[in-house]
């Protein structure tokens, strides 16, 4: 007989859906995010990314630099209710230089929505992020966007997804025309045609006119050529396509496909309704104590993101926690796995981009914001009851390196604070020279834009101007076995040794050729392209 709390947890899990959106830049991710919020009633009017001077800034792009450039460069958490469900939407950076932030966000997601531009198909960043989803066996839902513009043939797009990503596809709806001739979609769930009408530039919910495929009026409403093309293509996909298999969807082997136009809102609600039915509910996580089910009564969760200065007026630091099990309650006391400290979780917050509301309780699948007084690191576990720690979150190997210089000694404290807080939140990796005399931090990034963001934020949020001194390295490898393993092999040529933020040795190479030379010279030296972002918590017993 389940306890009262277990019943409460089971009901809460049943009513929760959690997903991250992945895409290549400019596929329309921020627009789709806003339109989902529009249908969820979380906002009443969508602020399109284009023509920002005339319209409101997009809700999910809250950082000043994002609003200036019109791109997403940090993950955002947006929570809203739709029908019977509580939805946690994890918006991720679209820019490829911020794939590491996206990777961390995917660790907290139960499902992924892959957004594809109908004109361009699969693009490099989408492929890269798909590989991350595949590693975690995340269910992937595909939204093929921009049907109101000229694009590639739908069958061609499905074939590309199947061939390049190795996924089976199931078209939940099917487009009627494209570009100027786009007239709507046929929904295979309801067996109805949904007619396309542009609505107020997409600011408000689309007007949804539905009609049966066999309705006599259809000949006067649809282009005859497109009507017969639709019938032929439906016959083709229903005869030759795979049937919908939710077990395969949940294992990440089949992707349900949706067609629509986020900018005009068309197809967004059809997607949202089907997603609630098909998506994976919050599930179990592996820990040092084995598999932890969401209905396990003791509260636990992990930190997947830190953000400084979400409200620059208050110089705050927020830790984003994915609730994995049990019920979170305001002012509860928990244990911090890495340090063993006991922490009281006061002032928890429900997050909505930059806005936050106080929170009384949360359940598995929810994302909560906690004030971070310098205690939390990315990958940290918090728990009640029996000791446990979840697997750490690994990080990407950086490819660009530069000394960060502070030319103004009077700003030393602000400089140190800014670098420390940006390092904590994972905006960039920070390394240090082995030589104690060289005290300038080394920025280590996946892409150039990360450097620009760090410099911009140091100036904008901490009042510190900085300059960069680029270093001629492009490959980083962590030394397995730490300093003792490194000392045992003696001097290493064609590499320099630096320390990461946790004091662990990292070798920097100018190119892959130098890395191969070191492998040849020191075959017993084990190197790794990835390292956990936090100190190993698997020591917790």
Curated annotation (Swiss-Prot):
Keyword Oxidoreductase included in the entry's annotation: no
Keyword Nucleotide-binding part of the UniProt annotation: yes
Main location: cytoplasm
SUPFAM superfamilies: EF-G C-terminal domain-like, P-loop containing nucleoside triphosphate hydrolases, Translation proteins
One annotated Gene Ontology cellular component of this protein: cytosol
Disulfide cross-links: none
Positions of the tr-type G domain: 14-283
Example GO molecular function: translation release factor activity, codon specific
GO biological process: regulation of translational termination
Signal peptide positions on this chain: none
Residues the entry annotates as binding GTP: 23-30, 91-95, 145-148
Sequence similarity: Belongs to the TRAFAC class translation factor GTPase superfamily. Classic translation factor GTPase family. PrfC subfamily.
Role, per record: Increases the formation of ribosomal termination complexes and stimulates activities of RF-1 and RF-2. It binds guanine nucleotides and has strong preference for UGA stop codons. It may interact directly with the ribosome. The stimulation of RF-1 and RF-2 is significantly reduced by GTP and GDP, but not by GMP.
Name of the protein this chain belongs to: Peptide chain release factor 3
Protein source organism: Acaryochloris marina (strain MBIC 11017)
């Amino acid at each position: 007989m389940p306890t009262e709390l277990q019943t409460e947890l089971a009901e809460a899990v049943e009513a929760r859906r959690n997903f991250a959106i992945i895409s290549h830049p400019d596929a329309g991710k921020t627009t789709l995010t806003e339109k989902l919020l529009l249908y969820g009633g979380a906002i009443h009017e969508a602020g399109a990314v284009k023509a920002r001077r005339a319209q409101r800034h997009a809700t999910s792009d809250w950082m000043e630099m994002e609003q200036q450039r019109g791109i997403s460069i940090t993950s955002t958490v947006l929570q809203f209710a739709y029908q019977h469900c509580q939805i946690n939407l994890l918006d991720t950076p679209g820019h490829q230089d911020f794939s590491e932030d996206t990777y961390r966000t995917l660790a907290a997601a139960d499902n992924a929505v892959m957004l594809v531009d109908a004109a361009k198909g699969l693009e490099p960043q989408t492929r890269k992020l798909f590989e991350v989803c595949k590693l975690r066996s995340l269910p992937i839902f595909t939204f093929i966007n921009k049907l109101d513009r000229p694009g590639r043939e739908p069958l061609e797009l499905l074939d590309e997804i199947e061939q390049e990503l190795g996924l089976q596809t199931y078209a939940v709806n099917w487009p009627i025309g494209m570009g100027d001739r786009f007239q709507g979609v046929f929904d295979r769930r309801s067996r109805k045609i949904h007619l396309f009408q542009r609505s107020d530039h997409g600011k408000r919910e689309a007007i949804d006119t539905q009609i049966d495929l066999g309705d006599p009026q259809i000949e006067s409403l649809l282009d005859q050529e497109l009507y017969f093309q639709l019938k032929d293509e439906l016959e083709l996909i229903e005869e030759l396509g795979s049937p919908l298999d939710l077990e395969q969807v949940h294992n990440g082997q089949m992707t349900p496909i949706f067609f629509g136009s986020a900018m005009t809102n068309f197809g967004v609600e059809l997607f949202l309704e089907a997603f609630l039915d098909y998506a994976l509910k919050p599930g179990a996580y592996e820990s040092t104590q084995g598999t932890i089910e969401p209905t396990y009564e003791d509260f636990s969760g992990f930190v997947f993101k830190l953000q400084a200065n979400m409200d620059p007026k208050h110089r705050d630091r927020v830790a984003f926690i994915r609730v994995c099990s049990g019920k979170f309650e305001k002012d509860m006391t928990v244990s911090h796995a890495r340090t063993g400290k006991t922490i009281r979780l006061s002032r928890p917050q429900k997050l909505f981009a930059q806005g936050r509301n106080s929170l009384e309780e949360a359940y598995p699948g929810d994302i909560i914001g906690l004030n971070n007084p310098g205690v939390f690191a990315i990958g940290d576990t918090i728990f009640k009851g029996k000791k446990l720690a979840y697997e750490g979150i690994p990080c990407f190997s950086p490819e660009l390196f530069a000394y960060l210089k502070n030319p103004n000694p009077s700003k030393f404290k602000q400089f140190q604070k800014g670098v420390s807080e940006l390092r904590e939140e994972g905006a960039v990796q920070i390394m240090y020279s082995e030589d104690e005399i060289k005290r300038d931090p080394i920025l280590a990034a996946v892409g150039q834009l990360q450097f620009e963001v760090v410099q911009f934020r140091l100036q904008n949020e901490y009042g510190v101007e900085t300059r960069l001194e680029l270093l001629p390295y492009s490959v980083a490898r962590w030394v397995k076995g730490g300093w003792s393993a490194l000392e045992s092999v003696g001097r290493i040529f064609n590499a320099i040794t630096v320390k990461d933020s946790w004091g662990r040795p990292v070798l920097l190479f100018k190119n892959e050729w130098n890395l191969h030379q070191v492998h040849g010279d020191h075959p017993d030296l084990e190197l790794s392209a990835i390292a956990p972002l936090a100190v190993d918590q698997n020591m917790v017993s």
